[in-house]
Amino acid sequence: MSEQFLYFLQQMFNGVTLGSTYALIAIGYTMVYGIIGMINFAHGEVYMIGSYVSFMIIAALMMMGIDTSWLLVAAGFIGAIIIASAYGWSIERVAYRPVRNSKRLIALISAIGMSIFLQNYVSLTEGSRDVALPSLFNGQWIVGSSENFSASITTMQAVIWIVTFLAMLALTIFIRYSRMGRACRACAEDLKMASLLGINTDRVIALTFVIGAAMAAVAGVLLGQFYGVINPYIGFMAGMKAFTAAVLGGIGSIPGAMIGGLILGVAEALSSAYLSTEYKDVVSFALLILVLLVMPTGILGRPEVEKV
């Protein structure tokens, strides 16, 4: 294989890795918007909290002498999902339910206030400095090599791909075949009609926040291990990128969030490799603007029909 092709292949691996985590976070945005038509701008902080919870659990278990990587990560996942889900439920109860029928601006201010509160809460309790995470997966597989360059897949990248696939598969099965999943789809189609048909819409909305928070927690664990460092402010940019992915794919569409996340991740990786790392954010948001100019509802978004 040529060196140029191997370099391109490596960037594709990196882009799919990053895009997979964006897709996980984007699901929370797209599910909440699909049902109540609001954006949860505190969602990125839930991702950040998931990272911190997994770090504390893994560090505690390592101090107890447990050093099996898969066991440590599994414990981190379970703890992060439980705590982040509780935060997601609390955000819906405190920041959204009281203002659900108010003007959109009030809900937006409430969400931003919750985001700032969570950032500062973690900063005060855990400190504002970067925290280094223990590296649990250090292996790699060489896919191809030339005289000066080799393309490889790290064990952590493979873990991210597998976990993301399983999480997406579980969510798809839940939405399509479970009773609560069908209730979520009914509420996304017409919230008022679903309420008239006897569906407990408050419970469905709360469940939507919980599912989104759980997905964000999974992404928090994965990205924490991938980058090896976390701080109380990582949620803001990750949340903005995931929101961009959701809009890019068509906000309100779960497959759209998946596609948007992968496109955004690949675009960032390629721009970092062939232009400069300083341009990756510019390229990401420019791509969003370009897509919205051509397809205002995103790649898989449906145009809203005004009912009269």
Curated annotation (Swiss-Prot):
A single BP term in Gene Ontology: L-valine transmembrane transport
Topology with respect to the bilayer: Multi-pass membrane protein
One function term, GO molecular function aspect: L-valine transmembrane transporter activity
Topological domain ranges for the Cytoplasmic compartment: 1-21, 67-70, 126-154, 225-246, 302-308
Subcellular compartments: Cell inner membrane
Residues passing through the membrane, by range: 22-42, 46-66, 71-91, 105-125, 155-175, 204-224, 247-266, 281-301
Swiss-Prot/TrEMBL keywords: Amino-acid transport, Cell inner membrane, Cell membrane, Membrane, Transmembrane, Transmembrane helix, Transport
Periplasmic face of the membrane: 43-45, 92-104, 176-203, 267-280
The protein's name: High-affinity branched-chain amino acid transport system permease protein LivH
Organism of provenance: Salmonella typhimurium (strain LT2 / SGSC1412 / ATCC 700720)
